[in-house]
């Protein structure tokens, strides 16, 4: 190798090491400041701005900018509702109106739309840079879920799109727990468990839109994981709670129990459906399964 080529190689190595060291230094400084002031505290915007000049395509930096704008965008407001449970929460105050009807008051998040859009733009850039980072994709879905307050059309669209991308791509997908950890490769089984968390959250919100999202996500996951008893049981739970169609609920619960006969959660739900139908024979059947 000629001396000129050796110099070029050495320069490239030095530049690479310097860039990595700079990246680590900004991330270290960010984590230290985050521990002291939070996502949007004093000095955070300046640090992120300087970081972005040095590393405009750093996923860690773009996530930091997302959290900064999202935190700045958030506020709270009090909303009156007739329901005794709203978005999975209980009211902080209940009063009676002039007709003697209970009015329940909830404190919920609200968002400044301009700052919320800024937060999403940072995430979109991170997804463009690293499309196979699940944690970044989840952040976008989670942001929409908080913003939409139970009418979760954009949330569902994002999650279903992610399911399609993950299940049809041959790429290795990574997940990073937080800014202090290293990303790891996610298996299909791990991804399935992550989607079960979304199913739970959709169901927990308890709105017509979220129940529909719960059903559609469970059906989509069942199409890929046909032997997973939980997704089949989820479909039964949709019919039990959202439709009050107890016969159809039992049909799916029985399918689920054929795959996993000792699933206590499914057995308990099937028992509820049997009692709703006032079918003592079925009730005894599920009670016996529960005791085994």
Q: Which residues does each predicted region cover?
A:
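Alpha-solenoid helical repeat scaffolds
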Residues: 28, 60-64, 135-142, 172-178, ...
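Single-residue signature of alpha-solenoid repeat helices
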Residues: 43-44, 119, 155, 214, ...
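Start-of-domain marker
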Residues: 22-80, 108-112
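Alpha-helical adaptor scaffolds
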Residues: 184-251, 255
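Short coil turns that delineate tetratricopeptide repeat
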Residues: 55-57, 130-132, 164-168, 225-227, ...
């Amino acid at each position: 190798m000629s001396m000129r080529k050796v110099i070029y190689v050495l320069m490239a190595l030095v530049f690479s090491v310097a860039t990595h060291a700079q990246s680590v230094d900004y991330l270290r400084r960010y984590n230290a400041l985050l521990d002291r002031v939070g996502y949007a505290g004093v000095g955070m915007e300046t640090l992120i701005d300087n970081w972005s000049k040095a590393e405009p395509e750093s996923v860690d930096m773009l996530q930091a900018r997302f959290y900064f704008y999202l935190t700045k965008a958030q506020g709270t407001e009090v909303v009156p509702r007739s329901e005794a449970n709203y978005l999975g929460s209980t009211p902080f105050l209940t009063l009676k109106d002039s007709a003697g009807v209970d009015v329940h008051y909830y404190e919920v998040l609200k968002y400044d739309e301009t700052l919320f859009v800024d937060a999403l733009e940072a995430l979109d850039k991170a997804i463009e840079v690293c499309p196979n980072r699940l944690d970044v994709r989840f952040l976008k879905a989670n942001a929409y879920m908080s913003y939409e307050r139970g009418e979760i059309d954009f949330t569902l669209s994002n999650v279903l799109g992610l399911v399609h991308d993950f299940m049809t791509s041959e790429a290795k997908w990574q997940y990073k727990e937080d800014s202090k950890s290293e990303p790891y490769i996610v298996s299909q089984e791990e991804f399935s468990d992550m989607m079960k968390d979304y199913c739970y959250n959709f169901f927990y919100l308890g709105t017509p839109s979220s129940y529909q999202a719960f059903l559609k996500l469970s059906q989509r996951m069942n199409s890929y994981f046909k032997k997973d008893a939980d997704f089949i049981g989820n479909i039964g739970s949709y019919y039990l709670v959202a439709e009050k169609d107890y016969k159809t609920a039992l049909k799916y619960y029985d399918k689920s129990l054929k795959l996993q006969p000792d699933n206590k959660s499914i057995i308990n739900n099937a028992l509820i459906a049997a009692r709703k139908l006032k079918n003592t024979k079925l009730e005894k059947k599920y009670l016996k399964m529960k005791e085994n």
